[in-house]
C-alpha cells in the first residue's frame, strides 16, 4: 500500500492513490503515468472543442475510453439536444467485452439528472466501467458532485482534477450561466496605438488587420448572438454574421435601441444574415442578461460596439471575457476613445500581425474544483 500524505491545519490526512498511479512522477498504474493521464484528458479537450458553436448553452465535453494504455473509443457532445459525450462514446464502442479494466476519461463530471438526455453517471454504471477520471466538477446545481458521488457509491474508482483549469477554461461561459444565472458576455473591440476606436464624425475606419478578421469570425462562430448599439447599426451597417467558416446557424443579431432610432431596411432584416432582435426601453443590463439566458436560452453573446455600449456593460460588471485588438502601427490623434477599464488586468495573448491581442477573463476560483472527500490529481 502506498499513501499520499497531506498535512493541513496540524492534521495528517491519508488518501490512497495507488489505483491511479498518482503517488509520484514515475509511478505506474496499468502502464500509465501522470503524463499519460493528462495526455488522455488533453484528447478529451480536443474532442470537446468539436462542439464549438453547436452545443450552447450546454457545455462542450469530450470523453475517451482507455484499456491497457490503448484508446478503445471516443465521444463528444456534438450538438445541443444530442447525445452527451459519454453516450456517443458507448454508442460507437461495439463489442469489446467486459469494461471493468477500462478507464473512462471525461472533461466534465458526468451528469446525474434527467435533462434532454438520461443521466450519464447511470449509463457508466450500466456499462461496468471500473475507473473514471474527471477533469472538473460540473457547476450546475443539479450535478455539482452528485455524478462522482453516484459512481463512488457503486464502487467505481473516481479521480478528479486532471487538467482542471484547462477543463474549466474551455467552458468559461457555462460557468457564468450556472454561477451568475445569466448569459455570458464577451466584449471585443479594435483600437489604435493611442487608444481610439474611430473618428467622432460618422465615418468608418478600419483598424484591425486581415489576420485579426479571420480570428474574429471564429470567435463569432462560437457565440449565440452578437450585440451592438443603435449608432453602430446605423453608421456601420454591420452584417454581424460568420463568414469564411461553416456554421450550423448564424448568430442572432441584437441591437440595443432604447429610443427607436434604428434604421431597419429590408437588407438589414434579411433572415439569411441571422435573426434580428431590437431591444428598446429603459434597460437594466443585469436583468436583460438574465432574461436572455432564462427565457431565450442564450449561453453567450458577443459585444461588438460601440464605445458607449461597451462602457455601459463594463461599468455594470456585466463583461466576463475581454478581447482587445490593438493596432500598434496606427494612431488617430483624436476620436472616439476606447472603453475605460483597468488595463493592469489585461494579459497579452498571441498577436495577429501588427495587431496586439490583449485579453481578460472573469475568474471563478475553485468553483468546480472537487469534492472534499474526492481523490484528486496534484
Describe these PLM feature segments.
Residues 54-55, 82, 148, 162-190:
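Proteins enriched for Cys/Gly/acidic motifs involved in redox and nucleic-acid/cofactor modification
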Residues 1-6, 13-23:
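Short, low-complexity, charge-dense intrinsically disordered segments
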Residues 65-166, 252, 312-314:
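Zn2+-dependent cytidine deaminase-like catalytic core
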Residues 144-148, 170-174, 238-241, 334-336:
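Short secondary-structure transition/capping segments
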Residues 62:
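Helix-turn-helix
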Residues 102-112, 180-191:
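N-terminal pre-triad scaffold of radical SAM enzymes
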Amino acid at each position: 500500500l502506498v499513501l499520499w500524505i497531506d498535512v493541513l491545519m496540524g492534521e495528517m490526512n491519508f488518501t490512497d492513490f495507488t489505483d491511479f498511479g498518482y503517488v509520484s512522477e514515475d509511478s505506474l498504474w496499468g502502464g500509465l503515468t501522470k503524463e499519460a493521464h493528462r495526455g488522455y484528458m488533453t484528447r478529451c479537450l480536443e474532442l470537446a472543442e468539436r462542439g464549438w458553436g453547436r452545443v450552447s448553452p450546454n457545455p462542450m465535453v469530450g470523453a475517451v475510453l482507455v484499456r491497457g494504455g490503448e484508446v478503445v473509443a471516443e465521444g463528444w457532445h456534438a450538438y445541443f439536444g444530442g447525445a452527451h459525450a459519454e453516450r456517443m462514446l458507448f454508442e460507437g464502442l461495439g463489442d469489446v467485452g467486459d469494461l471493468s479494466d477500462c478507464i473512462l476519461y471525461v472533461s466534465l463530471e458526468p451528469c446525474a439528472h434527467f435533462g434532454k438526455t438520461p443521466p450519464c453517471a447511470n449509463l457508466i454504471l450500466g456499462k461496468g466501467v471500473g475507473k473514471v477520471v474527471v477533469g472538473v466538477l460540473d457547476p450546475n446545481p443539479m450535478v455539482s458532485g452528485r455524478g462522482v458521488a453516484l459512481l463512488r457509491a457503486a464502487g467505481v474508482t473516481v479521480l478528479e482534477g486532471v487538467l482542471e483549469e484547462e477543463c474549466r477554461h474551455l467552458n468559461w461561459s457555462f460557468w457564468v450561466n450556472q454561477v451568475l444565472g445569466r448569459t455570458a458576455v464577451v466584449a471585443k473591440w479594435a483600437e489604435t496605438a493611442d487608444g481610439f476606436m474611430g473618428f467622432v464624425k460618422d465615418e468608418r475606419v478600419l483598424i484591425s488587420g486581415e489576420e485579426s478578421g479571420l480570428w474574429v469570425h471564429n470567435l463569432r462562430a462560437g457565440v449565440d448572438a452578437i450585440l451592438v448599439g443603435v449608432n453602430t447599426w446605423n453608421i456601420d451597417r454591420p452584417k454581424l454574421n460568420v463568414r469564411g467558416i461553416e456554421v450550423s446557424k448564424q448568430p442572432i443579431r441584437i441591437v440595443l435601441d432604447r429610443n427607436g432610432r434604428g434604421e431597419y431596411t429590408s437588407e438589414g432584416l434579411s433572415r439569411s444574415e441571422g435573426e434580428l432582435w431590437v431591444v428598446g426601453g429603459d434597460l437594466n443590463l443585469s436583468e436583460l442578461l438574465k432574461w436572455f439566458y432564462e427565457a431565450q436560452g442564450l449561453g453567450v453573446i458577443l459585444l461588438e460596439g460601440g464605445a458607449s455600449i461597451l462602457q455601459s456593460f463594463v461599468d455594470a460588471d456585466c463583461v466576463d471575457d475581454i478581447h482587445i485588438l490593438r493596432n500598434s502601427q496606427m494612431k488617430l490623434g483624436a476620436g472616439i476613445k476606447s472603453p475605460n477599464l483597468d488595463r493592469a488586468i489585461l494579459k497579452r495573448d498571441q498577436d495577429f500581425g501588427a495587431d496586439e491581442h490583449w485579453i481578460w477573463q472573469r475568474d471563478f476560483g475553485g468553483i468546480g474544483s472537487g469534492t472534499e472527500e474526492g481523490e484528486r490529481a496534484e
